[in-house]
Amino acid sequence: MADGLNRVHYNPSTAQLVEFALLRGEGELTANGALVAKTGTRTGRSPGDRFIVKEDSSAADIEWGPVNQAFEPGAFEGLWARVEAFLADKELFVSDLEVGADPEHYQPVRVTTQYAWHQLFARNLFIIPEEFNRQDKPVWQIINAPDFVCVPERDGTNSDAAVILNFAERKVLLAGLKYAGEMKKSMFSVQNFLLPAQGVLPMHCSANVGKDGDTTLFFGLSGTGKTTLSADPKRFLIGDDEHGWAPGGVFNIEGGCYAKCIDLSQKNEPVIWDAIRFGTVLENVVMDEHRVPNYKDSSLTENTRAAYPLEHIAQRKEDNRGAEPHAVVFLTCDVSGVLPPVSILSKEQAAYHFLSGYTAKVGSTEIGSTSAIQSTFSTCFGAPFFPRPAGVYAELLMKRIESFGSQVYLVNTGWTGGPHGIGKRFDIPTTRAIVDAIVSGELKNVETVHLETLNLAVPVAVPGVDTNLLNPVNTWSDKALYAEYAQKLAEAFTKNFAKYQVSDAIRNAGPKA
């Protein structure tokens, strides 16, 4: 993009970007030094406004539909040109960054933003390389123009805003949106398309590693505990949201964290609490009159966020990489109160539950979501971000689990003793005790009890956890009502899974309706 008429700031520092954001009225400084920015009416992702350009090089490999909406190449060219013209006289911020902390599987990306705080977000969440693009790969381009207003009749969009990915031209266009999470999820979608062709499984998961080099992965939708549980004071963080699993190891796709802030406390989440300081972007967080963030305030949105670089975490894996995982945890938030707090899965059950992605939308990251909690099935624990058919990712997961011998667990961070509104949610200390037992290997080869309707193996004891909690029927006062809810959940699983073409071994690994 030309910089003759406008001022362009290349690879600006954190301090410069904070100064620019404050001078330009884009945000305010909090008492803890973070920058607060508001995103207007769109306080989450806009899935109805996300498109992929339908062109010959990638069209046959994409699962088109409501998640991956098609956009015409000609319409994209016109809209890209109009956005470039709109930005031609604007002050801009540009950085050369990378996505993928692996010397073979990274993607170089040039990020151009209209807002200073969006550039700070990109530099926090993507990777700032010591040497840009060492392998001289073709460079992706992101343009983020939040003040551009799309016109559906002219631009071919669904509303006044759009997120459009173009694999042939290696371009990502964000127009009319202030919510910064769209930038990170766009490049995640890019890697989710590119990595399988390289034999790498892209994953919507967090990852950490112990002192002995043992890696654990945590899959789950927003709000199920990925970030909280991976930020473990006893372990070293690899990353909190996006990873690749290649033969030989896992790597972070990002260079930062995007942690949910609602009800954040120093006691329960000390690692995240301490990471929020100068350089952090707080999105839609409300402050009091003394500029102290009020993390309990959801008046703007439940989806309040902190975006900070991994350098803000003391206990982290500095190269953002780890060995192949000994333990893989699927986090589910069960609103029916039926699932046990932990189950031990066979590889066929792992494939079944990976494809199912059963959980709940808790403080959903999508616009239009309310604080109401509803159950959902999200393929691969991240359906909105995976362009290829689900089977591609499930096959890669099975291959990686089989070749390395990883043990997979299903951990319920949702309700017990009754559904949401009647039962109570598992507290963080209980889930942490379960995770501690998983990562220490204490749940390998233990005695289990089989839950027939759910078709799950549940350990009879977990160190530090009340034994009565382990079999969910024990926590319900009305046992007949539990059986009824369990049957309903099994039927929901079976109905959802009918769309998948899989082996009988995988299909039979699910609940028994």
From Swiss-Prot:
Enzyme class: lyase
Cofactor or coenzyme needed: Mn(2+)
Domain of life: Bacteria
Pathway: Carbohydrate biosynthesis; gluconeogenesis
Biological process, per Gene Ontology: gluconeogenesis
Catalytic activity, as annotated: oxaloacetate + ATP = phosphoenolpyruvate + ADP + CO2
Positions contributing to Mn(2+) binding: K185, H204, D241
GO molecular function: ATP binding; metal ion binding; phosphoenolpyruvate carboxykinase (ATP) activity
Binding site for substrate: R45, Y179, K185, R305
Function in brief: Involved in the gluconeogenesis. Catalyzes the conversion of oxaloacetate (OAA) to phosphoenolpyruvate (PEP) through direct phosphoryl transfer between the nucleoside triphosphate and OAA.
Name of the molecule in the record: Phosphoenolpyruvate carboxykinase (ATP)
